[in-house]
Amino acid sequence: MITALVPKPYRTATHYVTVPNCDNGTLPVTVIGLGQPVLLLHAYGMDTREFLPFLLPLTTKYQFYLPHFRGFGLAKSIPLTQFDFLGQYAEDINAVIEQICSWRDRDSIAVAAISMGAQVMWAYFERYGIEKVSRYLNIDQNLAIHNQHDWQGGLFGTRQTEVFDIFQELLDAGLEYEHVDSFNHLPHTLKRRTTDTERMFSLLSASQPRSQAFIHLMTHKTDNQLVFYNHETWKHKMHCLQAYLALPYDFRHVAETLTIPVVNLIGGRSQLYDPKWQSRVTQMLPNATEVILPKSGHAVPLDAPVGFYKVLKGFLENK
């Protein structure tokens, strides 16, 4: 009854797309709006519905498709079946794009993606090309995860070794508990180490004091709270971390194939991907324009919500 009072452009619905190598067969996709179809991909640890406040003013012109990556949001119970999680996510997104094009009778659609979601798109472009994507908005994501002799633009920049060592120590500490499914059954020290590491990652993603204060507020757990904390995505996040550390994830060779229009949105204070190296990505892309939000870190919607909305709106309007 209440839902019926909400105008159609502002209502959300959950659609399900058949994807390969999935026990229940389908992946949930949150859909909102009326108009041109747009695919929007979320970041690591994010619920895709966190995009909704930015989309509401645009829902009379665009219909947004927000897939939930396996292990997160409405798909938190859907496991990965491959170690290469970016590759499996790319397979899922290929199925989603094919289905949207079929539903909407389109040859291609616009895509916007942030952080891990953007890394998934590099993997998608490597496997499936650009035929089904008309335009692409890449949000604070580089082409290669690991620093190399000819590439120092990897994750965490000059601090990569330091931060990756922290991740590896956490993974090593959890090895003997691989058989444990519930976070509640882990020893307190490992639970604390896990939540502290996640908080560190989140704080590195933000640059604005208000954003960091919000992260502290949302992630702080007292010892008593930690006892009962049901961390449902714990194992999935560890899987992703293992893959990030072990697999090369270098998509630089893909850049020259992206002849479609690309907008490269960069957080000018990003600590996850050095803005100077992100600008090199712009130069490597044949048909790219660059937008820098000078006061934003990696978490662009959190640090610069107005700027993020304006760039997204401009991208959709082809401005």
Per-segment meaning from a language model:
Residues 296-305, 309:
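Catalytic histidine-centered segment of alpha/beta-hydrolase-like enzymes
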